[in-house]
Amino acid sequence: METFFITRKEMASLLLAMKNNRSVLDAMKELWIKRHQGKIREGYSWEAFLSTYLPPIFERIIQMRGTDKGLSLNEIVALGNQIEYTQISATSVQNWVKRDIKDHISTPRIGRKYSVDQAAMLFIVEDLKTTLDFHSIRKLFSFVFNNPNDDSDDLISPVELFELYSTIFEELDKDDNQIMDIGRSEMALMNQDHMLKYVVKRKADEAVARHDLTSEQKMVLSNLISIAV
């Protein structure tokens, strides 16, 4: 039976579709078609895939309508575990919400459920915690997202941030092996480790340059993206 795991960038696309009231089914179909050109040439169709198996969490978000875009913590965990090479535990997420980033994620925004941006924030924590302690994560979140109950003061929304750094990672991981690839021309500049940091930081700087932010804000946001990548 075929499984349907997706990359971080693809997950960001689904979250953006949910947030912007686009059809999640259409967004998911686009991702599936992009990944299965060979099977399509052999006559296998998206409709056939849908009729055989789709993870329950994907069925759930496909069925969301209008203001019903909230996710329980268990649903966020299930969704996060559809990202390639990711294993999020429900216990960890409970600890983040109740203790580690309690003041930054705030309370559920849609009834008893969490918003798409809150879900993205938890996915960002999952990526950052391999490099940073929670004290550092909280400091970055305070600077980038400011008041957790007011989206208007965010330097960038959590979903957009998740999409930004996952896009950079995929650009540098063209063969999808979770190892960033560096061009030979750049390889000559310095040793591999330093050069990798240089390339990631350069791409992060280019990404934040498009946002209307102060120099300090751009610097912090670029550093956060570099760490997440």
PLM feature spans:
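Detector for methionine-enriched segments
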Residues: M1, M11, M18, M28, ...
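N-terminal intrinsically disordered, low-complexity, charged/polar
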Residues: M1-E47, K203-E206, D212-V229
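Phenylalanine-focused residue identity feature
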Residues: F4-F5, F49, F58, F123, ...
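Intrinsically disordered, low-complexity regions
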Residues: R8, A12, D68, P158-F162
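Basic helix-turn-helix/winged-helix DNA-binding cores
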Residues: L15-H135
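Intrinsically disordered, low-complexity, charge-dense segments enriched in Lys/Arg
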Residues: S136-V229
